[in-house]
Amino acid sequence: MSNKKADSKPQAKYPVNLLDTPFPMRGDLPKREPQWVKDWEARGVYEKIRATSQGRPKFILHDGPPYANGDIHLGHAVNKILKDMVVKSRNMAGFDAPYVPGWDCHGMPIEIQIEKQFGKSLPAAEVMAKARAYATEQIEKQKAGFKRLGVLGEWGNPYKTMNFQNEAEEIRALGKIIEKGYVYRGLKPVNWCFDCGSALAEAEVEYKDRTDPTIDVLFAFAEPEKTAHAFGLAALPRAEGGIVIWTTTPWTIPANQALNLHPEIVYALVDTERGLLVMAEERVEACMKDFGLTGRVVATTRGDKLANLRFHHPLAAAHPGYKRTSPVYLGDYVTTDTGTGIVHSSPAYGVEDFTSCKAHGMTDSDIINPVMGDGRYIESLPLFGGLTIWDANPKIVDALKAAGSLLRNEHYSHSYMHCWRHKTPIIYRATSQWFAGMDTQPADGGKTLRETALDAVDATAFYPSWGKQRLHAMIANRPDWTLSRQRQWGVPMAFFVHKETGELHPRTLELLEEVAKRVEQQGIEAWQTLDARELIGDDANLYEKNRDTLDVWFDSGTTHWHVLRGSHKDQLQFPADLYLEGSDQHRGWFHSSLLTASMLDGRAPYKGLLTHGFTVDGEGRKMSKSLGNGIDPHEVANRLGAEIIRLWIASTDYSGELAISEEILKRVTEGYRRIRNTLRFLLANLSDFDYAKDALPAEQWLEIDRYAVAFSAQLQAELLAHYEKYEFHPVVAKLQTFCSEDLGGFYLDVLKDRLYTSAPASKARRSAQTALYHVTQGLLRVLAPFLSFTAEEAWRVFLPQSETIFTETYYAYPEIANADALVAKWTLLRDVRGNVTKALEEARAANRIGSSLQAQVEVRASGARYDALASLGDDLKFVLITSAATVVKVDAQSDESVEVAASKYQKCERCWHYREDVGAHADHPTLCGRCFSNLFENGETRSAA
């Protein structure tokens, strides 16, 4: 490249090596990035990476599938860019690290969209066709968004849970876990959403504040004599009264079937204006105050003495349909934190209630379950039939009051379960569902699912490490997994069930395979259109097709089966090295994947789990529409560049919350500019350097150049150790320090004089350029995983013959003799230079000098510092960026100092140094001897700097 012509005549007369580069100072990222995305696609860069990586050890990051609905948001951007950084850094570390993106396609949100657009009365076949089309459209939209962020992957062949092959393999996975004995059907309270009309997974439940009625209700004595004896009395002092419960769900009272007391809690019989009331002794004072009563404790007894006593239903006086009694069952889960120390039990609407009643001999057919799937009571329920439970709440309170059973009615604000899709309250509701049993003995007599999964958690590496305890606790305490859903757009639980007994067809495993073969050809629609007689002949008179679909968490939770070992088995492998998702996935994809793999394979589907936090604004608030603090990644990419989003993510400790604001983005942009300016300097000063022709061997380099390369190699080793542990923010922090301080603040600063003023092909300049070449080789590669657009842009300027930086591996720096000692020596020199710089700044502030080149310094130093400084000889002035420098030996560190004086000599017009020999050549009165030699003779000789 030719030298850039300067405007001033002296520079034209005495040229310096000021070079230019096509790598511009301004990134113009919003304009250039989309061109790079097109370029990568057109030239098949991802495919070239795959071809280059063939035969290397595999590293598999398995993509947790985003849901195919809606635009990508900042959380998506964080997740996909983190994955991209992992994959790129692993490829550059010498692995074969493919990236196959995927999408979760079935389930409620898409079905809701179809209902919104086309109504609820569409035939199932049309729902499925429209759902497929909708999901496909959403995938294309999201895919474009992810590509725009610089994410490289198999975009032409992603996995989709709705692809026929994946749907078929999921049915086969279901067959396997049935064969292994994990699946059963039963009546159980499950999370139920009235708007979905379906059971919900634990991960689909969120908690929001809600105000509900809270009531204290009296269940009148049904067995006064037995009650008296339980309290050690011959008889009750009076007939009126009963046992008191507290509840926030009045709508469950019509279905009450029992009362729960703790066996070891002491209960009191309290004489009040409302009769004799039974409650926990330690709650008497608070309850009397709440009820507005005065009371006297007549007797006390332990809870276990009251077991099996019966009390009248509180609505018995309101309608004959409630003339029944409720027995006392003992339960360890009863507490005295609030209420009366007595829990009313409606087994259809509470997990503990259900478990307690079943343990006391209640059968499924005994359980009263009047709430239908849409939230209304059955028409035949006395007093409240046909009402929604929420509308019934005040009417139940009124009926209790009229029956004389209400002691208190207030409102209570509490955190309550809501559907994550509809944002509406949900309930526990006993329904007949298909479950995976956590503590069921599998067919082979081995460990239970819970035991296997807990062992698998222990065998998994967690980043950050606290994730292990969190997932362990979730698995240890979770209920059985409700596998079934009552929807259309989902993979069918393709069973034939006996119409009378509910038993599975004896040929179920064989029949599931037959269905899977059909689904492989026609999709899940094949089950909808299948005539049972095709597969089971006359048995169709006895068996009916099961209409349930699989929980969508089973879809994504079995991707290790139908993607890693199914649709993409040629690219991927089982188990994956890493699953990487937001921290909510401990109860979502990490969780469901662990359970399915534990059932299918007896192990986790991943070797490591990496968790990132959520995005918050600059004040630490969660992003929400109501606060108006959301940040759209598209908007930021189009205004500042996707590179700024990538750098923000890479520079943030993702193990906690990721804070973002305009102020934070401004700081990130400034950091980006500093890195870009460093790259521009490197590329400009290498633009006339041909490594094959101009490079010097390391032993011929100047000492500071050997130091710079040794230091860069040591830094790279640190960075690669961070990359290996997925620690990106220390990589960014160290690289920013490297660019601004180690290079910009020291090495490049020192180098400018040599690069600009030495003869273009001199050993001094070629030494500097050879070192810069190696530094640039290494720097661009370690930047590439996160600053992908910029690293590629710079790489193509640096090595135009190379197709892409992403097929490279991390740089092998040349060996530098005595590298550790060299780095230690120059670390010492930089420390002294810092003291000199401070002294120069003080002299400048006092108007004793202008630039540092106007100064001559004397450094008094002792010991190793003196030795290091003295070893540089006349080159010390270049390191200190002064026109003259001397070093004087002193005995003690306390005697060390820096003296600054203004030079008495003239300033060279070309190099700006103040030297005694300026004008020594009469024909060149403004030129120093050094510049004269560099321009017209053999050039100056340097050894250190």
From Swiss-Prot:
| PROSITE patterns recorded | AA_TRNA_LIGASE_I (PS00178)
What are the binding positions for ATP in this chain? Answer: K625
Subcellular location, in the record's words? Cytoplasm
Q: Give the chief site where it resides.
A: cytoplasm
Record EC number: 6.1.1.5
Co-factor(s): Zn(2+)
| Keywords, alphabetical | Aminoacyl-tRNA synthetase, ATP-binding, Cytoplasm, Ligase, Metal-binding, Nucleotide-binding, Protein biosynthesis, Zinc
Q: Which residues bind Zn(2+)?
A: C908, C911, C928, C931
* Protein's UniProt keywords contain Chloroplast: no
Catalyzes what?
tRNA(Ile) + L-isoleucine + ATP = L-isoleucyl-tRNA(Ile) + AMP + diphosphate
Where the record places motif 'KMSKS' region is 622-626
Name of the top EC class for this enzyme: ligase
Motif 'HIGH' region — list its residue ranges: 66-76
Q: Name one GO molecular function term.
A: zinc ion binding
GO biological process terms, alphabetically, are: isoleucyl-tRNA aminoacylation
Q: What InterPro entries is this protein classified in?
A: aa-tRNA-synth_I_CS (IPR001412), aa-tRNA-synth_Ia (IPR002300), Anticodon_Ile_BEm (IPR033708), Ile-tRNA-ligase (IPR002301), Ile-tRNA-ligase_type1 (IPR023585), Ile-tRNA_ligase (IPR050081), M/V/L/I-tRNA-synth_anticd-bd (IPR013155), Rossmann-like_a/b/a_fold (IPR014729)
Manner of cofactor binding, per the entry note: Binds 1 zinc ion per subunit.
- Oligomeric and partner information: Monomer.
The UniProt comment on domains reads:
IleRS has two distinct active sites: one for aminoacylation and one for editing. The misactivated valine is translocated from the active site to the editing site, which sterically excludes the correctly activated isoleucine. The single editing site contains two valyl binding pockets, one specific for each substrate (Val-AMP or Val-tRNA(Ile)).
Q: Which family does it belong to?
A: Belongs to the class-I aminoacyl-tRNA synthetase family. IleS type 1 subfamily.
What is the name attached to this protein's record?
A: Isoleucine--tRNA ligase
Native source organism of the sequence:
Burkholderia thailandensis (strain ATCC 700388 / DSM 13276 / CCUG 48851 / CIP 106301 / E264)
